[in-house]
A protein has these predicted regions:
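Catalytic cores of large soluble enzymes that bind and process phosphate-bearing ligands
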Residues: 3-7, 41-48, 116-123, 137, ...
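General structural feature for long, well-ordered alpha-helical segments within catalytic domains
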Residues: 7-11, 32, 48-56, 120-128, ...
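Mobile "lid/hinge" segments at catalytic clefts and subdomain interfaces of large enzymes
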Residues: 70, 75, 79, 84-144, ...
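Acidic, Ser/Thr-rich low-complexity intrinsically disordered segments
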Residues: 162-197
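Generic secondary-structure signature for well-ordered alpha-helical cores
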Residues: 16, 20, 61, 65, ...
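Small-residue-enriched alpha-helical segments and adjacent helix-cap loops
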Residues: 1-98, 192-211
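A glycine-rich phosphate-binding loop feature that marks nucleotide/adenosyl-phosphate handling sites
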Residues: 32-33, 72-78, 145-157, 176-181
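Flexible, glycine/charged-enriched surface loops at secondary-structure junctions
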Residues: 25-27, 65-70, 137-151, 168-178
């Protein structure tokens, strides 16, 4: 509020220097990954939920999806980040990470299904990437993960993402490869001068006498 339109490129440039990127508020894609404060700042936290959330967002921002896609990482089973109503949610526990899928908030709430439990952050990230890619490849356009999971079944998704290590790695690799071409930050582009004429101040009109 209070920022003049012609000042926006400079504001976006400053945000970019601080490490911020343009999020997707309405796109059919990843929304900002929600986290709690995790083990660094909460006595109940079992893992670094904030750090894992940052990693997931850096990997997956800009991706196209059949519908909006929400992720969350809660640092303990108290679930302050509401990971169990997200499309992909992580619940940190003392021995690792519980991975949940197919949740939904809003009018028709659906609690997630437990996909599996893993021991390390890297495993959690690989499973997340594989699940996202499977959803992108097989869900119908405008399908949220909740109806998609109900339609194809949890056992099918587990068979592809959890039980088949080679298939999981291939799905994750396809997702990461595609992200090389998708992570285009409009703030950064405009800070560099793209559409600069849109932000230029109009010249004052000069009236000439009629002939």
């Amino acid at each position: 509020l209070g920022i003049e339109k012609e000042d926006l490129p400079a504001v976006w440039a400053d945000l970019g220097k601080a490490g911020f990127i343009s999020g997707q508020a309405y796109a059919k894609g990843l929304r900002t990954v929600k986290t709690c404060v995790g083990s660094d700042w909460c006595r109940f936290g079992t893992q670094d939920s904030t750090g894992l959330g940052v990693q997931l967002e850096k990997i997956s921002w800009g991706s196209n999806m059949p519908h909006k896609f929400k992720m969350a990482v809660s640092g303990c089973p108290r679930n302050c980040a509401e990971a169990t109503i997200k499309d992909f949610g992580v619940i940190c526990v003392d021995s690792g990470y519980e991975l949940h899928i197919g949740g939904n908030g809003g009018i028709k709430v659906r609690v997630t299904d437990l996909l599996c439990k893993v021991a390390t952050e890297s495993e959690a990230i690989e499973h997340a990437c594989a699940f996202v890619q499977l959803y992108r490849e097989e869900a119908r356009y405008l399908d949220r993960t909740a109806p998609w999971v109900e339609r194809v079944g949890l056992d099918y998704i587990r068979g592809v993402v959890v039980d088949d290590a080679e298939g999981r790695a291939a799905l994750a690799a396809r997702f990461l490869y595609s992200q090389q071409f998708m992570q285009d930050d409009p703030w950064a582009a405009r800070a560099k001068g793209f559409d600069a004429d849109e932000f230029a101040t109009l010249a004052a009109p000069v009236l000439e006498p009629a002939q």
